Amino acid sequence: MATANAMFERMANTWLALYLPDSRPSLILAHSARRLMDRFNQSIWSVTLSGTEEPDEAQPDSQGCAAWFADSNKKALLAEVGVGTLDQAMMAVMPFKHNNLRLLGLSNKILLADEIHACDAWMSRILEGLIERQASNGNATILLSATLSQQQRDKLVAAFSRGVRRSVQAPLLGHDDYPWLTQVTQTELISQRVDTRKEVERSVDIGWLHSEEACLERIGEAVEKGNCIAWIRNSVDDAIRIYRQLQLSKVVATENLLLFHSRFAFHDRQRIESQTLNLFGKQSGAQRAGKVIIATQVIEQSLDIDCDEMISDLAPVDLLIQRAGRLQRHIRDRNGLVKKSGQDERETPVLRILAPEWDDAPRENWLSSAMRNSAYVYPDHGRMWLTQRILREQGTIRMPQSARLLIESVYGEDVNMPVGFAKTEQLQKGKFYCDRAFARQMLLNFAPGYCAEISDSLPEKMSTRLAEESVTLWLAKIVDGVVTPYASGEHAWEMSVLRVRQSWWDKHKGEFERLDGEPLRKWCAQQHQDKDFATVIVVTDFAVCGYSANEGLIGMMGE
């Protein structure tokens, strides 16, 4: 959603250039939390429309989004231009209620999807079904990725080919074939290299750290030099623990230290995003000196930040490439001030990776014995080992020159996996094919036409993502006996929400004071929530309530 919000901000400044001056198209933000974005809310035509749905020309916000499109997610794609999460389009080819409205909204439109390499096996198969349907309806699809493997590309090409009812096979690519354009039409397949501008070429050296103590020392050195530095951790608990260690060590002043992860209420998350952009964003200047951010994957793609130095936990190679893109992203002088042109005056960028000691013949517990939480977050340990191997061999991430080599050395079909990961590799392959098969069952079968036989699944069981179930939590304060939202201002209850994994909540729910009994019943009646499923956490003193604006939801962690 953060990525969609950022793109909406950019599109809002340019989208009218796509239309004639006298046109009145609508620009919609299509995701479930759009009501929380002020700029979108301000763009909705506030006048009462009727008949032709023409807005009042004197209305300053009339060049935005008609209210009729904005009052329901199922109608969002009917707007002329939409920016949102891919889920909103994927629901068109799954048995969700009103999926026909979404299909209608996609008709005669170009579907443009970015960062498609991030789709897991389930989402990739749903995306293939969406692409096939787009092609069969005569619509264009544009897919973008900086780290797409050849295997993924071939599946996407095959999906579009099925839609246009012709059999094509994209040519094999060499390690130097990047950037690359593949175009499939009803009559031909074009596959060719794309020229890149010299100014977008980047080179980031790789360094290795093998203990958290070494990482903390590096942070201290960066702060002493006046550099800003980020440490991207793979788990929330690891991020919080290091944040606390830095606070206790006094290496970094509290006001220069920031923590950012997914277990913050929307209210605090928006504030932290703004702080992050102010301290580490493109326009940051003197205020960035000596600043430290400990974060998780939330800053990999959605925020345009620019760090002088960076540490990352070992992660799959495509994610490390994304993280490296937040290191010295913009040209600056030696004091960290943005330059319009010329050479960057900072030290050579180095992505330092916290990883296990290198082992040519790793055992099954190679990763879990050194980085337990990372092993849980990224269970394909063989790909993690392959990532470390290729980065050790190359020593540098050179973009775009080495992109294909790096990706295919980890995700290619012909990679040699160590014997120690044989069991893990079998489990991962089994899960991959199982997830794809399950996703195939969830796709609508359009062949019989508009009838009950197009799906055997029930809409209430649908999800665009195959992931562990999450729990929605509301944060509340008790003021003079009255239950009030944690956040203030407009949409206060929505801004007081956060979501956590079901397993995490089952493990930690006993550590929180929760609303129950008659107060919970009254709250549910007021907020139109189901009493059997609603969970409201009472926020009081941080030491006992398990939530703070600076650390997020942690329970009794470390107690």
Locations of the language-model features?
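Conserved RecA-like ASCE P-loop NTPase motor core of nucleic-acid helicases/translocases
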Residues: 1-4, 142-144, 228-234
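Conserved Walker A/P-loop ATP-binding site and its immediately adjacent core
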Residues: 1-16, 27-38, 148-152
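Inter-Walker segment of RecA-like/P-loop motor cores
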Residues: 20-95
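Short basic/glycine-enriched coil/helix segment immediately N-terminal to the Walker B
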Residues: 75-79, 95-111, 286-290
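Post-DEXD/H (motif II) to motif III coupling segment of the RecA-like Helicase ATP-binding lobe
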Residues: 104-110, 117-192
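C-terminal helicase lobe and adjacent C-terminal extensions/tails of nucleic-acid helicase motors
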Residues: 153, 213, 217-220, 224-283, ...
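Conserved interdomain linker/interface between the two RecA-like ATPase lobes of SF2 helicase motors
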Residues: 165-239
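SF2 helicase motor core recognition
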Residues: 285-288, 293-310, 325
